[in-house]
Amino acid sequence: MLLVVFALILLGGWWYYDLQMAEIESLRVPGDAKADLEIAKMRLETVRATLTVAAGIGAASALVLSFRRQQHDEFHSTQQRITELRIQAVEQLSSDNATIRIGGLYNLERLGEQHEELRQLVLDEICSYLRRPFDLVTSPPADPEREVRAFAQEILQRRLKRRIGRRNYWSHNRLDLTDAALGVVDFSDCRLRNVNFTRVRFNGPAKFHGTSFEGPTSFTGVVFEQLVSFFDARFDDQVDFKEAAFSSVADLSRASFSGAAWFTKARFAHEVNCSLAEFREYLGFTGVAVDGYANCSGTVFHSYANFSKSVFAGGADFELARFAGVTIFEEVAFEAHADFETVSFGGWTSFARSTFRSSASFEHSVFKESTVFRESAWNWRASFLMVHFNATVDFEGSAFLDDVSLNGALLRQLLHDQSLPGRYRPVETSKGFRFLWTVKRDGSEPVVPQRRPGDAELQLRPGGPELRSGVESV
């Protein structure tokens, strides 16, 4: 520091002296003795002034350097004090006294509020506390630890709200709650980044209304003991619900999934509501068991959707859904009514080896690419009323044990006769192959829908599929 001050004095003094001497020399008049005397006096004054300026520069430099040293010392002192406070707060979290533990959480929150750069560390400490083993199921209601954990959750929920303003929102890079035991949770309207809820047990209702999940999100192996709602939630990256257990109603209505979503081997013990949800990337719903009613009406699947080997025990409603990519329902068991009415299948679709143990309806739906129902089993009524197959459809090896309705269905391309439900014959028209009758299981007279202008007049003889009248252009 002394060398810096000395260098500043020399440079400043030299610059000032050189500038003044140049101006004095410009006043010299050759042969004028009086002028020479005045110049000599001015040189002397310049020397004195230079020394004064140098001294001033030295004093100012010393003052600045002293101020910076003071700032440096104060910064280190503050950092040391912050470290001490953080250590003290963390130590309080290990106290046997619940009141002291709550005080430690309060002190951590205050540190994060006053020092923005510490907020991630504070969130890490709070998450670490919630990851400590604790059984909310077997612990008595009066256990003071319940109050401590509820306060820790409340800090997270309060500080991560989007609507509290930019200054009050705690920006973060991660939230790791792996194996945590949580009570009643409300992360509604929060913005959560890189959240890890792996194997978390939610022992109370969990609300994520309008929550924004940024970065990869994991709910792998999570257990929701009570109702959980992701209504209008936004997942900006991939999300993983593999082997998740939903013990009560699950609401994912209007949720938006911008990245891949995995629900592999998840278990829904009650109703699941995915109505009006949107899946923009791959959806893996394989090996899933839904014991209650599955409502996926109006849901949009922009990419590959795979429901293979899943079980829908309480009914499945996909009415008005839209599948834009490849859709797989292979080896799926529909134990109750399956509703696929007015559905748009935009890509290759397969229901191969699936079982419909109750009624199934695909009325007014559109299959834009090839469709496979090969080796499927239909135990009750199946309706394809007014369905449009814009490419080939394959029912080969399928078993229909009750009535099958293809009234008004339109098939653009014929794979081969054996690919259709038993006892049906395709009738070629100007627009494609039409089916305007219903075949009864017992071979009785079919029910023919009321003829509309342009429809073909087709009937079946009892006991056989032969035509009784000609075909008009359609």
Q: Where does each model-flagged region fall?
A:
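Short hydrophobic membrane-inserting helices
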Residues: 1-58, 260
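Transmembrane signal-anchor/signal-peptide helices with a preference for the extracytoplasmic
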Residues: 18-19, 57-81
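Membrane-proximal helical linkers
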Residues: 26-40, 71-95
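Short alpha-helical segments used as structural interaction elements across diverse proteins
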Residues: 40, 45, 65-66, 98, ...
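N-terminal leader/targeting and pre-domain segments
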Residues: 75, 83-92, 96-102, 106-109, ...
